[in-house]
């Protein structure tokens, strides 16, 4: 993902979910970025540009031990 795109997504997630969320580019991947809550990795956000419509999908695994 481009830096401007990451900046916009990070701003949205900070306003919507938590102000300490950070999004970091993934090496050699241009369709996704890593999402962190503080220093803890919490998931991946994917860019979906299908049929001319751009959307994003956030994927987060929740371990049973964390419940």
Regions found by a protein language model. Give the residues of each.
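Terminal leader/tail segments of proteins
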Residues: 1-67
């Amino acid at each position: 993902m481009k830096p401007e795109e990451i900046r916009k997504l990070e701003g949205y997630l900070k306003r919507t979910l938590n102000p300490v969320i950070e999004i970091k580019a993934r090496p050699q991947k241009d369709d996704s970025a890593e999402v962190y809550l503080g220093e803890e990795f919490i998931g991946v956000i994917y860019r979906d540009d299908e049929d001319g419509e751009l959307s994003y999908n956030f994927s987060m695994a929740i371990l049973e031990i964390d419940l």
